[in-house]
Amino acid sequence: MQIPFKKDPIEFKQRALFATNVFDLLPSDHQCYVYEDIFEQLDTSSVEEQFSVHGQNAFHPRLITGILIYAYSQGVFSSREIEKRCHEDLGFMFISHFNCPNFRVLSDFRKDNHEFFKECFKQSALLAMEAGMASLGHVSLDGSKFKANTSKHKAMSYGRLKAKEKDLTDEIEDLIAKAAKCDEEEDEEHQDKSGYEIPEELKIKEKRLAKIKEAKEALEKREQDLNPGKKIDDKKQISFADKEARIMGKKGNFDYSYNGQISVDEDNQIIVGQHLSQNANDKREVEPALEEIKETTGDLPDEMSLDNGYMSGNNLESFDGKEIDVYVATGKGEKKDQRPIEDSNRKIKKVDFNYDESKDCFVCPAGHTLKLRTETNEGKKVYQGDKSACDLCHYKARCCSSKKGEPRTIHTDDKEPLRQKMREKMEQESSKEIYKKRKKIVEPVFGQIKNTGFRGFSLRGCKKASGEFSLACAVHNFRKIVKGILGGKVCLESGELAPTVV
């Protein structure tokens, strides 16, 4: 007996008398409908100004922006793959209005409008705030490394650049000398030719030398900006493909990357501030982060939490006068050992010393004073104890580690009072409870961004990569808004997002 499987609908092999709407095949609650409603509200006037009335009509910037945002939300980043989806995927067809922009159009728009994508991110954050999805009550800041569009194998150290530049210069001079000699000796025999054909070889070497010089000059400028007047270490490297990317470590691996910084609101994990940094660590990222939050939302948060990577004098100083209740975790070396000094043989660390701001000195566990010995124009300070007091102290073996027998020395800077206050604040149980929020606020967001497939940049150069990072952050916010609408947390009223009334 033949099993009666389901048959294909008759419309599959026969044309219907009346055309049907192909989008009826999509579920009524498909996310592309919500994205389309949101995209209609995007302000693209700043990009529209760059188009001309002459020539062939261009795709509207709002359409291209919508396609890119929707594509990133679906984990599609290749411009060729996006074009393909516009031909094959119903959701993409709806977002693109049955248009299929060439991959070059998509790629060039993404490459040439990095400033607009920052504005696009701002609109996503404000839209979320208007929908009641972010309140700036508690914001957490964190950073993560994103791979640059280059390779460690397309790089060279400063020492090798200098050596290679000299070698190529010598080789080119040698080739030119040989060519001139051949011209003189064989001009009559070969007439228009030298008889010793080398132009192509010379051309290749000259191109290589130009690239070497360009990379060397870029590295010298970078190091001069970072360390004015200091000699450049021969081990410093630069990438030929993306000269603005930096070698950064992540879980024991090193690669050319950028440091993506995001400030995330507690309410619904909306990103309210973002920027891309070339710094490998987070020691100086608070000031630009606060500026971005202010520029994006027009205000600053009531509370902020940051991990111990931000525990630096410069970062803490950035909060001065901002009226933000800040919680910064102390580093492993800055946490007090709970074991009593008297009842254990543990080493005495810097954190065991109390700083007296009024007298500008440190007091050791034995009650001796470490006075200020030297101070530089950059704010670096060195405090040192009295040698006779240290020699007679019963803690000396656990405290003084100098092989020369010098008294206990503490190296710090003029920001020490700020660090001490933060350490004391973070020892309180109430502070620890507030800080616990951080793990649930910002860390999952990086996971969500990377789970879509965005782990590195398609564009090169800090400005263009910053634009792509802004786009990725805007996509995250739009995904949250769409999820909120589909989940009933927010609704559309009169074409605008508004909180759902419960």
Question: Which residues fall in each region the model found?
Answer:
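Hydrophobic alpha-helical membrane-insertion signals
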Residues: 1-32
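A ubiquitous short alpha-helical element
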Residues: 3-5, 51-55, 430-433
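Basic, short loop/linker segments at the boundary and entry of helix-turn-helix/winged-helix-like folds
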Residues: 27-69
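Anion-binding and metal-coordination hotspots
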Residues: 68, 75-88, 99-502
